Amino acid sequence: MLSRRAILAAGAAGLTASLAALPTLAAARKGFVKVEDGRLSLDGKPYRFVGANLWYGAWLGAPAAFGDHARLTRELDKLKSLGVTNLRVLGAGERSPAKVAMDPTFRGPGEDYDQTLLTGLDVLLAEMAKRGMKAVIYVNNFWDWSGGMPAYLNWTGNGTWFQQGDPAHPWPAFADYSARFYADEKANALFRHYVKTLVGRTSTVTGKPYRDDPTIMAWQLANEPRPAGSEEFGKANRPAYDAWIDGTARFIKSIDANHLVSSGSEGDMGCLGSEACVVESHKTPAIDYLTLHVWPNNWSWISMTDQPSTYEAGAARSRDYIRRHIALAKSMGKPLTIEEFGLIRDGRAFAPGSPVTFRDRFYRMVFDEVEADMKAGGPTAGVNFWAWNGEGRAQHADAWFKKGDRSYVGDPPQEEQGLFGVFDADASTLAIIRDHAKAVKAI
């Protein structure tokens, strides 16, 4: 098992000193989002935002045949026109045997990182800066659509490769496999080398070190890191999981003392269904704020095949989930962002402009909860809907992603292209987002 000493790696004394110095350093830097009195702030004022997930931003920004700088600027302009000022983006991607995954990726098992994609991230951040946007950059993934933790395990030979959704290895086999990552010292050494390179990077576009760029709001450890899929393995793996969150967050802060760090957790649905799990794994001062994801379809709270008869109960359960985690954030004295939420289209359609009756109701409900907590002076700083498809479109009649596709959308490769994402043709949803942005600005 990976020891706490191995995870911290850089030396406890140096990391502790770096962490202790963070508030002073961050406070002196204009334009950086920080934490004050359990809430996010920017230059002495509350930082509130309406955000979106644009995981593929670096791919669009890349100066290569697979990139599309012109589309990137159009998408950012459209998002800005809606009042979106915060984007959650992917800053990593690992080559893997996954049947459906992103290609190209930021890296393989060696240290020859893809400079074209890294330049794409430089371009994305520079374009966001022009529009006054902030970025949350996640640097790993629990799921295999970008390679993620399973790819690292595959490189180090830790067990047989498990494909997410493989009927030969039903749930929770994949999640238990991916969660082995936290205790794998070799896998984490590879991961930390990439993190050190990325966080310590200097932009090829602006010439500014990432650590000095206020466009970045936060570094995020991973997309939806879970301690396990099964309760049995989860209990055994919790010490490694908790130590990995604390150690990785401290490692990032030892490189960059100016930016916030978050975990990317879903909340207790991604922590063995336990609020205590969330508290224990996030009580470290190296984690600056809590994150929450709300997925009623994926969690079987609202049926994908019968939304009309299951929506009310599922929406009520989602509302309670949000409120419980707001209360949890208050009790911990930490800010909260609802950085993923979504609902499928009516009848599980995928086409742009197809009816989104229940999705629109769900968006309004989430936005109402956020606005209410903001008005009450609560810990909620903002939301990032999942996800922005914009002018991207499915390239195949069955709406499934195929290797080599370049019309990127927010729905990742393992899902139908259009399942949860918001297209530029979804007029009713765009209006709801725009109205929410106006309401947040008025608070």
Label every model-predicted segment.
Residues 1-14:
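N-terminal secretory signal peptides and thylakoid transit peptides that target proteins
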Residues 1, 19-30:
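C-terminal segment of N-terminal export signals and the immediately downstream linker at the start
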Residues 306:
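Acidic-aromatic pocket-rim loops
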Residues 32-302, 310-335, 341-368, 373-436, ...:
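Active-site mouth of glycoside hydrolases
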Residues 14-22, 268, 343:
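Hydrophobic alpha-helical segments of integral membrane proteins
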